[in-house]
Structure formats: structure tokens, C-alpha cells
Amino acid sequence: ISNISSGPKLFQLYVHKDQSITDDLIDRSRRSGFDAMCLTVDTLVAGNREKDHRTGFTTPPKLTLQSLMSFAMRPSWVFNYLTGKKFELSNVKKKTDKGTNIAKSVIEYINEQYDPLMGWKDAEYCAKKWNGPFALKGVMSVEDAKKAVDIGCTAIMISNHGGRQLDG
């Protein structure tokens, strides 16, 4: 991205259970010329997404009569899936083989590596390690906004990402 864009760049970070992955992402972002870091704290666990339940969307996808009919009506989807480039989590592929090839492994990676127990000490560690413009995304209260400033955040981001996760 740094090679093709002269605009400001922000890296969105999630804390991993394996500290070396988090450290590597921060270090690589700095070396790649990112200007700011944003730690996302509002989607650490998957929510109850009611629309997905209504439409039958699952991860990993389940073969149902409806999905089989969709595949049959769109054979190019199946062809592209079977012959195309396999999905990979490029940022962490050197650290893990999870997140490659099939949707199930992406979810396994998120469940195994994203740390739902991360707290203020983790956020402070990331802000200090980054040592530059640092935002906390998903702040939900005035008290949390003040705490974010206290640990070294230079910005906060208020979003409905986590709300959507929790509310469906």
C-alpha cells in the first residue's frame, strides 16, 4: 500500500493471543510506512446476527438445498472456487497456516487467535509499542474515552460495528 499511495495510512489492529503476532503486525506496519494505528476493541467475539439467521448464512457455509440450487444456477462460482486463488490471511501467513483455503479455517483462526479477554493493559502496550498516532476503535462511554487518553491514545473512534455485532 505504501508503494502505491501517497495518502495517510492507518493500520487496523486486533490483539492476538500469540503476542508475537501482534508485535509483528505493529512492527511491519511501522516499516511499511503506516502513519497511524487503530486498535479495534468492539468485535472481539462474533455476535448474534439475526439477519444471518433469517437468511441462513453460516460460517463456514453449510450445504443446504437452497445453497445447492444457488451453486447449480451459477456454475462459474463453483469453477472459480475450485480453480481460483485460495483465500489467505496475508498478514499472518508466516505465523500460522490457519486462514488458508476454506472459510472454516478463517473462523477457526479468529476464534483461536483474537483475544476476547484483551483489556486496558493490552491496549496500553500496543499504544506504547506503536509510539505514534494511536486510536482506539469501539469506545462506548465517556469513562472509556478518558481512559483511552490516559493510556496514550491520541484519538478514539466511535462506531456501530460492535453494536451491530451485539444487536444482530
What are these regions (language model features)?
Residues 168:
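Shared catalytic-loop signature of beta/alpha-barrel
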